[in-house]
Amino acid sequence: MALRLATRRFAPIAFRRGMATTIEHTKEPISATAEALSASRPPIKETKTSTVKEPQMDADAKTKTFHIYRWNPDQPTDKPRMQSYTLDLNKTGPMMLDALIRIKNEVDPTLTFRRSCREGICGSCAMNIDGVNTLACLCRIPTDTAKETRIYPLPHTYVVKDLVPDMTQFYKQYKSIKPYLQRDTAPPDGKENRQSVADRKKLDGLYECILCACCSTSCPSYWWNSEEYLGPAVLLQSYRWINDSRDEKTAQRKDALNNSMSLYRCHTILNCSRTCPKGLNPALAIAEIKKSMAFTG
């Protein structure tokens, strides 16, 4: 437990300003506990699986360079760095996730990132690629080999390791809105809560959110107030339940947002709507919540 707490506290924040700025390291020194933990660990011997080795290139190889953010919590005194990898695009799939998987499988097994469905459904592989928050499985590799690609973890998140962000605060906020159907009365037929076609249509553009956090971590207001401001993703989810005709706790849901921080830190910067890999519009959902609260309380 002590190791986990030390790692989370001193994991660097990937970005301080903007979505593609130079990394700044924290000014705060490493604690004595973290140093002791690091010193007490035996050194890891280099093996074939831990040695970075570029694959052999063919004569007609279409090479592209990827610069990837690296940070290892097992070496807390080492600063984050960018590590470069060169791949032959002729032997690599079309998506950024294909490149990352090939690097991990064939070049550097120590590279760490999240991934699961590879179809833009789970949201696991959210990261910042060439200055844009997106899903690696949906982001195509630019075919222009002269331009090098830079890959970072999601901006302004604590880093667990390499491209893995700490989503603890994000999911804590999601839990706070009670993202489930709340009713005091049972359905008339005792089977299910029915909904008209028109009411169901009101949920389009809301239920598709996969909680990848691309929008929230692109929002400057969320960067500055992430402890109190819920952020675009959670507010879109909140509107999804406020707008659900089957839910009977609409008033309570609005009351929970009726303070100066949870909702009203949105300043319509619209980064969230621009970056959403699913094409949703969190800014519109936030505006609709504000409008409904202004007219109905």
From Swiss-Prot:
Task: Alphabetically list the UniProt keywords.
Answer: 2Fe-2S, 3Fe-4S, 4Fe-4S, Electron transport, Iron, Iron-sulfur, Membrane, Metal-binding, Mitochondrion, Mitochondrion inner membrane, Oxidoreductase, Transit peptide, Transport, Tricarboxylic acid cycle
How is this protein organized at the quaternary level?
Answer: Component of complex II composed of four subunits: a flavoprotein (FP), an iron-sulfur protein (IP), and a cytochrome b composed of a large and a small subunit.
Per UniProt, a ubiquinone binds at W224
- Pathway in which the depicted protein is active: Carbohydrate metabolism; tricarboxylic acid cycle; fumarate from succinate (eukaryal route): step 1/1
What is the name listed in the Swiss-Prot or TrEMBL entry for this protein? Succinate dehydrogenase [ubiquinone] iron-sulfur subunit, mitochondrial
Q: Residues in domain 2Fe-2S ferredoxin-type?
A: 78-157
- Where does it localize? Mitochondrion inner membrane
What gene, per UniProt, encodes this protein?
SDH2
Function, as annotated, reads: Iron-sulfur protein (IP) subunit of succinate dehydrogenase (SDH) that is involved in complex II of the mitochondrial electron transport chain and is responsible for transferring electrons from succinate to ubiquinone (coenzyme Q).
